[in-house]
């Protein structure tokens, strides 16, 4: 304020940019609800309908912003060219591996106009529980019953829940049924016109049998654990489901900023958040993993950490996708908007 700046909480009518193409927005009520697998499911549906899709990702303003005005990612090499952090890679890499082009940056009108040149449909891939930057034809919002009640307790996540055309209650296969019911009741109370889809996100591990009886270090998506307030993620579920003998406490092995992360977020005890906001922090994450006394590392992050870190022990990746019934339900909603063409 001393410099004369004004600060306001802006509404969607003031901030959303209109596209010349149909827009499907995927947002959430909290970090770590499952936007990423929902976005991947939506792009898969659109491609099966013969549509060209451009995914536009919510900004993550790290580094020199003057070099990030309008970014286009079509290959894994593009992630290196733009010096992407682990957090950025976690959002971009799964899209790229699925054959999707991702746009990001800081000038979101310019980004939209570039994306429109390549696409029949724009996918807004939300982040930070923020509202869509683009005016959507279909607003899909993901909620998490592992954090029941958060859908009406956090801003701007609750704003998304109130604006949604479709609310996808994710992770119902691992959540308490009463918590699923609580989320559904809250959504019906604040947004009675929203269509509700109950979804599961089953986890899978290649060579899962090798987990049984092992002492396992679990590495999870960082933001989900930290400002998302989760105590565990897909890696922890995979370890439990596949008979790990021990889930190793990572805290005694943490160094530098990773150690400070555990101090700042004391609810995180059994899993290691994959923090990587720069080269130094990536190195500290690598050192923490390599120092851990374990037989196996289970990586529950959306990216292949093995491409970025030199891990000195066996490691397995955990993946997760939406289940087919929820994908079918999403397809019905998308066809309703796009006319099934």
Q: Where in this protein do the model-derived segments appear?
A:
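N-terminal pre-Walker A segment at the start of P-loop NTPase domains
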Residues: 2-8
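Flexible phosphate-sensing "switch/lid" loops adjacent to ATP/NTP-binding sites
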Residues: 3, 15, 23-28, 37-186, ...
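Phosphate/pyrophosphate-binding betaalpha-module
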Residues: 192
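Pre-Walker A adenine-sensing motif
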Residues: 9-18
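Conserved glycine(s) of the Walker
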Residues: 33-34
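Short conserved motifs of the RecA-like P-loop NTPase core
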Residues: 199
């Amino acid at each position: 304020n001393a410099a004369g700046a004004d600060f306001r909480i802006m509404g969607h009518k003031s901030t959303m940019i209109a596209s010349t193409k149909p827009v499907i927005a995927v947002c959430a009520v909290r970090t770590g609800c499952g936007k990423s697998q929902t976005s991947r499911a939506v792009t898969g549906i659109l491609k099966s309908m013969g549509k060209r899709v451009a995914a536009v990702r919510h900004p993550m303003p790290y580094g020199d912003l003057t070099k990030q005005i309008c970014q286009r990612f079509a290959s894994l090499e593009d992630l290196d060219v733009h010096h992407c952090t682990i957090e950025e890679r976690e959002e971009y890499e799964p899209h790229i591996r699925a054959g999707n082009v991702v746009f990001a940056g800081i000038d979101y009108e310019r980004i939209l106009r570039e994306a429109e040149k390549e696409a029949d449909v724009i996918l807004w891939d939300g982040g930070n529980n923020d509202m869509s930057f683009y005016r959507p034809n279909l607003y899909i919002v993901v909620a998490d019953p592992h954090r029941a009640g958060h859908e009406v307790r956090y801003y701007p996540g609750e704003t998304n829940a109130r604006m949604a055309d479709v609310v996808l209650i994710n992770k119902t296969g691992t959540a308490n049924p009463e918590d699923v019911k609580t989320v559904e009741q809250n959504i019906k109370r604040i947004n009675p016109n929203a269509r509700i889809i109950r979804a599961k996100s089953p986890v899978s591990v290649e060579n899962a049998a090798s987990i049984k009886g092992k002492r396992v270090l679990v590495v999870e998506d960082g933001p989900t654990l930290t400002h998302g307030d989760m105590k565990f993620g897909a890696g922890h579920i995979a370890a439990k489901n596949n008979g790990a003998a021990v889930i190793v406490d990572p805290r005694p092995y943490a160094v530098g900023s990773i150690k400070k992360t555990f101090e700042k977020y004391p609810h995180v005890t059994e899993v290691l958040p994959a923090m990587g906001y720069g080269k130094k922090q990536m190195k500290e994450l690598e050192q923490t993993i390599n120092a851990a006394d374990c037989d196996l590392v289970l990586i529950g992050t959306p990216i292949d950490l093995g491409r970025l870190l030199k891990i000195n022990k066996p490691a397995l990746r955990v993946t997760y996708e939406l289940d087919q019934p929820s994908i079918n339900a999403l397809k019905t909603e998308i066809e309703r908007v796009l006319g099934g063409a």
